[in-house]
Amino acid sequence: MKLFLSADIEGTAGIDTWDEATPGERMYPYFAAQMTREVAAACRAAGKLGLDVTVKDAHDIARNIDPSALPENASVLRGWIRDLYCMMGGLDRDSYEYVGFTGYHSDAVSDGNPLSHTMTTGLQRVMLNGKPASEFVLNAYMAGMLGIPVIFLSGDAAL
């Protein structure tokens, strides 16, 4: 059985400024390593349940996670493919039984995280059914559309 794990960075433990989430900035390597540690922990937990894990590196350049730091039951999808799935690129109903998320953050209108946004900082807000939608909400609906249940979420407290 397989878990599809979408990993972002703005909800990673301790992160609180944009330069910490931006490749090439001074503190970015520390938080990319923290993102990797959180992803690895989720993969180890999934492994204890007998699950193989495909991790979608879903932040910025999509090359933030160190694949060598992940357990044997995990593989990483790096880079972007141009499709509607975006942060869920690679997900399909025939390959995965479960979906999980690490490092996710609250929506653009939330004050729960200094890095709150939805998809891009250029959008003031994204609304779904009359309510502000976070990337987690949008991506969880995408999994639901495929009939794949969400079993795990880690990120900021405002989610």
Where does each model-flagged region fall?
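Short acidic, Gly/Ser-rich segments with clustered Asp/Glu that frequently serve as metal-coordination loops
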Residues: 10-14
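Active-site glycine-rich loop that binds ribose-phosphate moieties when present
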Residues: 83-84, 121-146, 152-155
